[in-house]
Amino acid sequence: MGESSEDIDQMFSTLLGEMDLLTQSLGVDTLPPPDPNPPRAEFNYSVGFKDLNESLNALEDQDLDALMADLVADISEAEQRTIQAQKESLQNQHHSASLQASIFSGAASLGYGTNVAATGISQYEDDLPPPPADPVLDLPLPPPPPEPLSQEEEEAQAKADKIKLALEKLKEAKVKKLVVKVHMNDNSTKSLMVDERQLARDVLDNLFEKTHCDCNVDWCLYEIYPELQIERFFEDHENVVEVLSDWTRDTENKILFLEKEEKYAVFKNPQNFYLDNRGKKESKETNEKMNAKNKESLLEESFCGTSIIVPELEGALYLKEDGKKSWKRRYFLLRASGIYYVPKGKTKTSRDLACFIQFENVNIYYGTQHKMKYKAPTDYCFVLKHPQIQKESQYIKYLCCDDTRTLNQWVMGIRIAKYGKTLYDNYQRAVAKAGLASRWTNLGTVNAAAPAQPSTGPKTGTTQPNGQIPQATHSVSAVLQEAQRHAETSKDKKPALGNHHDPAVPRAPHAPKSSLPPPPPVRRSSDTSGSPATPLKAKGTGGGGLPAPPDDFLPPPPPPPPLDDPELPPPPPDFMEPPPDFVPPPPPSYAGIAGSELPPPPPPPPAPAPAPVPDSARPPPAVAKRPPVPPKRQENPGHPGGAGGGEQDFMSDLMKALQKKRGNVS
């Protein structure tokens, strides 16, 4: 050990000597003349070597573990950067691929080539910014899928399910159920299955469905005790099965389904219960002037506050003594906890009041016929008793009021004190039910009336015209058929008359054929004119002019048939002669005269003219007068000329009457 230290010292001294020689050689060659301060250079060298030694010592003292930790941290950071760069490159590739696919599909749908798509893709890749990094969501991992159960576990699970189902069925079987017979106000009954989970509101809803009534808020279940002669209505929140369970097996009690305005009268007119006792004169005026807004505010103040406000009721009532039929008059006060009375010789202060009954375990009932049964002062009684008391008992309290108004106020006040806000909630639920039912009813009536209007409207509109037009058409067609038949019969008679007088036949039709205009224009003008047309005078032969029948008697033939038909000759010249001075007798009387006295008549006029007359040419009354026309035109020419003026006046009056009738009909 001593030798090694000596060797080190020797080596160190040798090194120092060599360093001195080196510095001397460098100073002789390069440096200027020696500096007056050579010891400073030695100091610098000695200082530098000292710093080197200190740095070496510091390196030796430094912890290698810390260096390794730093190195590992640098390596991990580099790896993270590499992984991040790879992710970004993959995202860019996916984004560019999706963009390329969308652009290519759009270009393909528009009919562009692949070159355009490629250029568009490259352009979009250059212009688009890099996609944002995926947000890191701290979402819980989905639960692992359940492991498949073994056969034993499946059997155990199935057994547990069966046990659970059996327990549910057992629980359902334990639910108490009753068959309730509900009496209607028309003496009919409805049977309902009611279980212990149903409230009176549920039973009412079932009855609404069965009876199809209007779901008014006044409908209620009404409980009647014939033995005690008391009755009441169920509150909507009461359990029906619990109440019916208190009845005895041989009871005569009944449940009715009827309307009672007293059930929710306080919510319709709250001023009658809250403001009635503050002043009789003021309350009457207030009751008359109370509007809906004030009623609503009064209800909110009474039922929607921190505590329920019970009506301030107090007054003298008659109390039935226990076990007796005698009644005593006492002064009672209504409070939220019960009814109190003022003992004899005491005041109405709270410390002097005595508790009469509390509302916790009693129900309120109306008394019926208590004046007859219990010798009550009036028939306006109410009763307070426990629900389980079904027969006469000393624990039943009977009170009697002076009038119906006082009775209703006390009964409603007791209900408000007993049920509180629940009563208001029941009313709101009943109103909502009634409003929903009314909306459905209105919707049903609107839907039912909508198809009825178009069905009845056109029906009535069509029946009136169809009832009139067919009748008119039928009458016109019947008249035309009758006229045609009459014309055919007269046509059969006309050739017979013409055969007897052949020499006179050919003269009349051929002479005026070319000179006279066709008659239809004259007839048409007479048709359209309001007054009878004046017939034109024809230049015919013969001294006596025969009268042409008025145009009103002749149906105007349509223009085409008489012009185009060569078989129909024009009317005779005598047709246009002035009216005669006499009125020809009716056609039936001429039939016998024509065969013996009359000269040969001219050829018959065209008989089928009345047949083709259209229905719209003339009104039905004018057409009805057409049948007698052919006989007049045949037989008038045979009369000698000359007639009186009185007959002409008669003819003109007849024409005016017919024209007036036509105007009334049209």
Curated annotation (Swiss-Prot):
GO biological process: positive regulation of cell adhesion; signal transduction; T cell activation via T cell receptor contact with antigen bound to MHC molecule on antigen presenting cell
SMART domains in UniProt: PH (SM00233), RA (SM00314)
Compositionally biased tracts (Basic and acidic residues): 483-504
Annotated keywords: Cell junction, Cell membrane, Cell projection, Cytoplasm, Cytoskeleton, Membrane, Phosphoprotein
Tissue: Widely expressed with high expression in thymus, spleen, lymph node, bone marrow and peripheral leukocytes.
Organism domain of life: Eukaryota
Bias-annotated ranges (Polar residues): 453-478
Gene Ontology cellular-component terms listed: cytoskeleton; cytosol; focal adhesion; lamellipodium; plasma membrane; T cell receptor complex
Quaternary structure and interacting proteins, as annotated: Interacts, through the N-terminal Pro-rich region, with the WW domain of APBB1. Interacts with RAP1A, PFN1, TLN1, VASP, VCL and ENAH.
PANTHER family: AMYLOID BETA A4 PRECURSOR PROTEIN-BINDING FAMILY B MEMBER 1-INTERACTING PROTEIN, GROWTH FACTOR RECEPTOR-BOUND PROTEIN
Name of this protein: Amyloid beta A4 precursor protein-binding family B member 1-interacting protein
Encoding gene, per UniProt annotation: APBB1IP
